Amino acid sequence: MSCAGEALAPGPAEQQCPVEAGGGRLGSPAHEACNEDNTEKDKRPATSGHTRCGLMRDQSIWPNPSAGELVRTQPERLPQLQTSAQEPGKEETGKIKNGGHTRMSNGNGIPHGAKHVSVENHKISAPVSQKMHRKIQSSLSVNNDISKKSKVNAVFSPKAASSPEDCCVHCILACLFCEFLTLCNIVLGQASCGICTSEACCCCCGDEMGDDCSCPCDMDCGIMDACCESSDCLEICMECCGICFPS
């Protein structure tokens, strides 16, 4: 059976149309009313046939019915509870936006659990960072001390190479050299007659005096006697060393 066959099937009312007794004219009001009734009845089976065809098409989607059984009920739509469960409503979304975030997180948007974990990690990492900071400071202080000692050793290395005895020897030699020059000058002045002054010598040996000159030539400054005695010279040198090197 096709949909078109059901739509075009004539109704029983269309076959029997009462004819007015007054001659059966086509343009009479009774005949027009009969035609209107027939057209309405034709429309009703056609619409019912279309709905039946739609039901059969919808039934093709669902499992096939048993043989010879027509589909007379239209499948209902799925309940809206499933869609509402999948898609939350406006009220639920508003609650999630307002209450859900306040429950899951604080004002900064950080979850409470994460905050506690971060605080604990910070407490644990704080002593470690302090220990590392102390180690770095100690290593830096040790490096600074080593660098300072190396600089001091580099500055005082020439002086440390020479012992204090060597310094004293150098001072003694310098003192002896200065006194030796003075002594040599005095000896040369006394050896040549007429060159020495009255302050250095009490008498002058001239040609006129000859060998009979008994005037003793004595040095009032006492440099010759001081230089001849080694102990006095060493004492002078030690005093100079004490002045130059108090330590």
Curated annotation (Swiss-Prot):
InterPro entries named in the record: MDFI/MDFIC
Any one of the GO BP annotations: negative regulation of protein import into nucleus
PTM-bearing positions, type Phosphoserine: 129, 141
Superkingdom of origin: Eukaryota
Stretches the record annotates as Disordered: 1-67, 80-110
Single GO molecular function: DNA-binding transcription factor binding
Main location class: cytoplasm
Domain MDFI: 74-247
The protein's name: MyoD family inhibitor domain-containing protein
Gene name of this polypeptide: Mdfic
